[in-house]
């Protein structure tokens, strides 16, 4: 990887580094059911994948008559975090890929996620990657606009003092991929199949240049990538 083609690598977290979407959305499904909106886990994933609860607050209110407020979000996050603490596992191959890429770009890696910072720290610590990212963890909820706007990726590039156009982004959702593309980065997709990730064609349709099914392939794919 001596001639690595990117100055930095920016990772989404949920569904890229950690297999959190089924856990988070199971909790969300239960809590929406308590409000009267009865969904299957697959339906919840389809609606909320790559988004925050607040993104869909108008729809929740339309379906339940309940206006999502800060108190409800606090209860949701508490239940979600307890489930993540108990059950969370890394995406297979992700820790090894992160450490390999950390070495390839001399530590210039960052997390750029739409999730809240407490969740990000919990998840990175749980899978043993907090040390790799250090302070280079950016939450879209702390930006003026969250994904699909590019703000979180632009902010992550700034923390590393790199040009976004010289960054590779790794995403698994259409919402996140749109953000990376809008930031001017080269976006690679991860879509292993099954619920919890956008499908490969949907990612390609929004500007992703290549989709992986196995995260273990990521370092070699990025190292050998040439613009086509």
Language model features by range: what are they?
Residues 1-7, 99, 105-106, 116-228:
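Asp-based, Mg2+/Mn2+-dependent phosphohydrolase catalytic module
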Residues 2-103, 121:
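N-terminal helical cap/lid subdomain that shapes the substrate entry/recognition surface
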Residues 12, 16, 113, 172:
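Conserved G/P- and acidic residue-centered "switch" motifs that form tight phosphate/ATP-binding loops
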Residues 17, 90, 109, 169-170:
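Conserved SAM-binding loop
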Residues 46, 112, 192:
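Glycine- and other small-residue-rich loops at beta-strand/loop junctions that grip anionic moieties
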Residues 75-83, 108, 222-228:
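Electropositive, surface-exposed helix/loop patches at the edges of structured domains
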Residues 90, 112, 145:
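Residue-level marker of regulatory loop/turn positions in helix-turn-helix DNA-binding domains and
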